From Swiss-Prot:
UniProt record similarity statement: Belongs to the natriuretic peptide family.
Function: Natriuretic peptide that dose-dependently induces the rapid relaxation of rat aortic strips phenylephrine-precontracted. Acts by stimulating cGMP production in a dose-dependent manner (by probably activating NPR1 and/or NPR2). May also show potent hypotensive effects.
Cleaved propeptide residues: 26-70, 110-120
Keyword Lipoprotein in annotation: no
InterPro entries: C_natriurtcpep (IPR002406), Natr_peptide (IPR000663), Natr_peptide_CS (IPR030480)
GO cellular component: extracellular region
Disulfide bonds: 81-97
Entry protein name: Natriuretic peptide
Keywords from the UniProt entry: Disulfide bond, Hypotensive agent, Secreted, Signal, Toxin, Vasoactive, Vasodilator
GO terms assigned for molecular function: hormone activity; toxin activity
Length: 120
């Protein structure tokens, strides 16, 4: 009987490597993965005119003419940074992306605090 110390020296790797071999020296047959023809069939259908036009809009042009994609890119861009609306930063402080009106200059923001308080 082989001791565990011998198997730990590298014999274990040899046993694990030879494990899939059958007694006659041929590799054990591997199980085949089941095919799912229902998922493959829709992709084999011919492309119609409407779907071909949709695919043409999604695929970038090969000749370098990107004017067709400019309209789609502008539509996808939202009111905030990277298409996401930013309420606190963009609206309140004016520090967000895609601002429509520039932020007021610093002196205009400070003036209301510099006015003397009237006591009546």
């Amino acid at each position: 009987m082989v001791g565990l110390s011998r198997l730990a020296d590298g014999g274990l790797l040899l046993v694990l490597a030879l494990l899939p071999l059958a007694l006659d020296g041929k590799p054990a047959p591997l199980e085949k993965a089941p095919m799912a023809p229902a998922r493959i069939i829709p992709y084999l259908r011919p492309v119609g005119k409407e779907s071909r036009a949709a695919l043409d809009r999604m695929v970038p042009p090969e000749d370098g003419d990107s004017r067709r994609l400019e309209g789609l890119a502008k539509e996808a861009l939202g009111e905030g940074c990277f298409g996401n609306r930013i309420d606190r930063i963009g609206d309140v402080s004016g520090m967000g992306c895609n601002r429509r009106t520039p932020a007021p200059k610093a002196p205009l923001r400070i003036l209301p605090y510099l006015r003397p308080i009237r006591k009546e």
